[in-house]
């Protein structure tokens, strides 16, 4: 279990708002925190062990500039409790890519072996999230783009979905494209989209983070689907998985999520009241 955030604003720096959003999902992970931003030219990243207020002493977020950004709070389910495992993870091949992941890849070892055999990358951690990052980067490189477009991202994601098993909800920066969010074909981990009247968008693990920061809930990211918010604020949506079967993790309703969150149109607190036994 981890908490992830993605944010786009038409003109303003998003690092402070990502900081505020990470506070709202802090309950999903206290091991480490990180923020990455993109200003259409440069990617900035800071991550450390600790809770959000320890890693970022103020909401100024250590001068992370950019109108597109992602954030992560970590609860370790794979890898170890070391700063090298803190997210977001970064790759510069074939373009600047930064990824924040909530979930567990059940075939991570198989995918890691496959990638090592391609000689496309090396690995610095034991994290399955680093595997997911490099798998996407590898598939993106295979599109052989001249000018990177959203169609190349969707094509790469379709290949990722063919190969990956397990649960994943992801926010990602792809330089030259924008903010990407996608969710596994079973919808095991939650992911929601919100919007403000000023044209800014937020993606978050829980709807409670949207409402706390004044975003109107748009919809859940559908299982097996991806959303791209371009650097110009244009939203594209696409189905990437060949087969979809909605099977959310029940622990999201009764343990992981805040009671004021709504997951796939179901209130977490209402679900708990319906399922927990009563004393008689």
Task: State where each predicted segment sits.
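Conserved short alpha-helical segments that host acidic/polar catalytic motifs at enzyme active sites
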Residues: 1-223, 228-274
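A short, hydrophobic C-terminal helix/tail in secreted or cell-surface proteins
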Residues: 275-280
């Amino acid at each position: 279990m981890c908490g992830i955030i993605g944010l786009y604003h038409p003109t303003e720096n998003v690092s402070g708002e990502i900081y505020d959003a990470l506070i709202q999902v802090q309950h999903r992970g206290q091991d480490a925190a990180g923020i990455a931003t993109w200003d259409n030219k440069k990617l900035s990243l800071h991550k450390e062990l600790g809770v959000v207020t320890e890693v970022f002493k103020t909401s100024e977020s250590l001068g992370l500039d950019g109108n597109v950004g992602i954030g992560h709070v970590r609860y370790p389910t794979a890898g170890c409790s070391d700063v090298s495992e803190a997210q977001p993870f970064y790759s510069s091949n074939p373009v600047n890519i930064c990824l924040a992941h909530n979930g567990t890849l059940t075939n991570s070892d198989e995918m890691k072996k496959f990638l090592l055999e391609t000689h496309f990358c090396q690995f610095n951690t034991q994290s399955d999230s680093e595997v997911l990052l490099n798998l996407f980067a590898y598939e993106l490189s295979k599109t052989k783009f001249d000018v990177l477009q959203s169609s190349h991202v969707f094509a790469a994601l379709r290949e990722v979905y063919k190969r990956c098993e397990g649960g994943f909800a992801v926010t990602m920066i792809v330089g030259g494209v924008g903010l990407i969010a996608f969710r596994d074909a079973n919808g095991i981990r939650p992911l929601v989209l919100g919007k403000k009247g000023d044209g800014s968008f937020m993606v978050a693990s829980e709807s409670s983070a949207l409402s706390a920061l004044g975003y109107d809930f748009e919809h859940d990211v559908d299982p097996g689907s991806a959303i791209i918010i371009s650097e110009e604020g244009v939203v594209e949506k696409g189905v990437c998985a060949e087969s979809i079967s909605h099977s959310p993790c029940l622990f999201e309703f009764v343990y992981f999520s805040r009671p004021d969150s709504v997951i796939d149109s179901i209130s977490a607190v209402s679900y708990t009241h319906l399922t927990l036994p009563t004393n008689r």
